[in-house]
Amino acid sequence: MAPRSRQRVDIYLLGRGIVDGVSQMTLEAMDALRASRLVFDLSGDAKAIRKLHHNVIDLFDDYWTGELCDDVYKRLEETIVAEVRNNGPGVSIVVDGHPMVFDDVNWNLLRNSKRRRLNVVALPGISCLDTMMIDVGADLGDGAQIVHVNQLVLYGISLDPHLQTYVLQIGKFGTDFFSRETKRNLPGRFTPLAAYLTRFYPADHVAILIVSLGAQSIRRRVRLGELDSARAFLHRHQDDGLTMYIPAYPRPIANERFASAIDDLDHLKTIADLA
């Protein structure tokens, strides 16, 4: 049965997880998909989605056009809204990963839904961050920085080397033509990024370039100062959800008094009534 809703749903925003197929898709998302009139696939695995629904439109060719990313996102958003306006509610969009992690199309649909008088419902899914912390063996609960590679330099974002860092879309550094096909990366493409990162980390600090696929994950270790030496690897996997994981430096305790207090029952009695 479809997920409960007080009113009809015009658009469901769904994710099928990181690995190929739908093994990481939640039961709630599958129910919503099966209850839909039409499914737009932006996940890159329309074949798997067609096993769950008979009416699937693959938007692969509409996505990989070589245009600027914002132009692609706008057109896809307009396509989905036009379908609902012209033919009625009951549309689902399926993407890879979590539907609301690093997905401008879905966020625009959700943020503009009230103005358009559309009921847009996003359902949780499994993102690359969920799987990557298992792949690299680091708990996000210890604190993390998650940044888009171009925004890192564009906005001059300062990084804390004592927090683990995930740099998304690293293979697309230096361009917004993210779906424009290229033959190779020229020498020096990643030199400005290496220079930026080594403002916060030593040049010999080792990072991991990773495509998170569980047991089939693809990785390459590289020193930050030598990042440009991995340009062939970065090109080969630029469209595969490639991320750079930078491990954290250990951080010493800065407030010994607070550290002592949080383990002290007498201190707890001074800030709360015990049961």
Residue map of PLM features:
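Class I S-adenosyl-L-methionine
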Residues: M1-L123, L242-T243, H267-A275
